[in-house]
């Protein structure tokens, strides 16, 4: 795991050097999560992740890429660095 952290840090540095970095970060374990539901009159706060899943989000990147091919190439490099799957999505309203 220590090597994955080092490789991810190196990947982050490369994103910054190449001008793709916008924001990113690792997340605390899902067991430390709080779920907030403010839809009703009283806000309800519960412990734990909202979703039951074998795969949990350990972190994320927000990058800037000129096209989908570049984003996919960067995602593949990020996946290799962090030793996990990377999901690619554009922000709503972007091409």
For each feature predicted by the language model, list its residue ranges.
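Conserved, structured core segments of small domains
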Residues: 1-95
């Amino acid at each position: 795991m220590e090597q994955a952290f080092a490789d991810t840090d190196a990947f982050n540095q490369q994103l910054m050097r190449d001008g793709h970095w916008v924001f990113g970060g690792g997340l605390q374990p899902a067991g430390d999560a709080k779920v907030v539901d403010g839809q009703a009159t009283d806000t309800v706060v519960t412990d734990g992740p909202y979703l039951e899943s074998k795969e949990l989000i350990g972190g994320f990147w927000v990058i800037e890429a000129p096209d989908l091919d570049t984003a996919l190439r960067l995602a593949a490099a990020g996946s290799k660095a962090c030793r996990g799957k990377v999901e690619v999505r554009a922000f709503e309203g972007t091409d």
